[in-house]
Amino acid sequence: MSVAGLKKQFHKATQKVSEKVGGAEGTKLDDDFKEMERKVDVTSRAVMEIMTKTIEYLQPNPASRAKLSMINTMSKIRGQEKGPGYPQAEALLAEAMLKFGRELGDDCNFGPALGEVGEAMRELSEVKDSLDIEVKQNFIDPLQNLHDKDLREIQHHLKKLEGRRLDFDYKKKRQGKIPDEELRQALEKFDESKEIAESSMFNLLEMDIEQVSQLSALVQAQLEYHKQAVQILQQVTVRLEERIRQASSQPRREYQPKPRMSLEFPTGDSTQPNGGLSHTGTPKPSGVQMDQPCCRALYDFEPENEGELGFKEGDIITLTNQIDENWYEGMLHGHSGFFPINYVEILVALPH
C-alpha cells in the first residue's frame, strides 16, 4: 500500500475512534437508506439460515450429513464423480424389511407382507431422493447464488461507502486546514458510493418476487413428493388389506403335537436300538378301509346347514362324490353329507 493509502487508512481509523469513544457525530444517512439497509441485512441472515434449515429438513441426520460432505469433498479432490447420495431413512427401513421378508419366505403371512412394505419403502426413498434434487436445484442453489453474488456485492458497496464516509467526515472536521478541492472530492466519492449502494439495495428489494418464486418451487416439490408418497402408500395398503382378508377367510390350523419319546427298559440280555428310546405314534382312526376313496380331516368342521357332514380333526372320511371344486360328499360313522374340500387331505382319491 502506498504512503497516501496508509495515510488515508489512518485518517479513517482516527475518525472511527473519535465517533465511538469521543462521541463525535458522523454524517447521517437518510431514513429510507437505513430502512433498505435493514431489510437487506435481514434478507441476508434469512437466506443463510433458511438454506441451513432446509438442508437439515431434507437430511435430518447430522452424522450422515457430515459423512456425505466428507465423501463428496474427497471425490472432488480426486477428480471423481460425485459420491453416493444421502442415506434416506426409508431406504434403510426398506433394506431391513426386504432382508427379513426373504429370510421368512413365502410360506407364511408376515414374510411376503414385509417384502411388499419394504418395496414400498424403497420407492418412497427414491421419491425422497427426487425431492432432494428438486429442492437443491430450484430453491437452495438460487438462494446460494443470491447470497454469493447480489448480497455479497451489496456488502462490498456498503463497506466502501462506510470507508468514504469516514474519510469525508475526517476531512470535514479539518475544513480550512485542508484544501477545499480535497474536501469536495471526498464528498463526491461519498455521494457516488451512497448512490451505488442505494441502487443495488433498491434493485434487490424490488426484485424480491424472485425469492417468492423460489419458495413456490420448494412448496411444489414437497407437494409432488407427498402426492407420490400417498399413491405408493395407498397401493401397498390395498395389498395388505387383501392379504388380511384372504388370511381371515382361511380355516385356522390347529397345532398337532408330534409323537412323544418313550423310555423302554431292556429285560434280560435283549438290547434296544437308540439306547432304549422309541417313539409312540398316535393311533390311526379305524373303521375305514384304506383301499377305497377317503380323506383325513385337517380341522374340526361344524355343520351350519342341513346336509353338511360334521367331523373332528383326524377323522377318516369315506369319499362318495365331488360336488364341485369346493365341496365333497362323504360318509362318517354311518352319516352322509357335504363338507368343504380345504378342510381335508386326500388319502385315496376318487376315481375319475
UniProtKB/Swiss-Prot annotation:
Residue span of region Binds and tubulates liposomes: 1-125
TM spans (from-to): none
Effect ascribed to mutating F202W: No effect. Indol ring not associated with the membrane
CDD domains named in the record: BAR_Endophilin_A1 (cd07613), SH3_Endophilin_A (cd11803)
Domain writeup: An N-terminal amphipathic helix, the BAR domain and a second amphipathic helix inserted into helix 1 of the BAR domain (N-BAR domain) induce membrane curvature and bind curved membranes. The BAR domain dimer forms a rigid crescent shaped bundle of helices with the pair of second amphipathic helices protruding towards the membrane-binding surface.
Keyword field: Cell projection, Coiled coil, Cytoplasm, Endocytosis, Endosome, Lipid-binding, Membrane, Phosphoprotein, SH3 domain, Synapse
In-chain residues carrying the UniProt-annotated modification Phosphoserine: S262
Name of the gene this protein is made from: SH3GL2
Function of the protein: Implicated in synaptic vesicle endocytosis. May recruit other proteins to membranes with high curvature. Required for BDNF-dependent dendrite outgrowth. Cooperates with SH3GL2 to mediate BDNF-NTRK2 early endocytic trafficking and signaling from early endosomes.
Segments forming a coiled coil: 181-248
Effect seen on changing A66W: Vesiculation of liposomes, no effect on liposome binding, indol ring located in hydrophobic core of the membrane
Domain BAR: 18-249
Protein name: Endophilin-A1
UniProt tissue specificity: Brain, mostly in frontal cortex. Expressed at high level in fetal cerebellum.
Family matches, as InterPro entries: AH/BAR_dom_sf, BAR_dom, Endophilin_A_SH3, Endophilin_SH3RF, SH3-like_dom_sf, SH3_domain
GO biological process, one term: regulation of receptor internalization
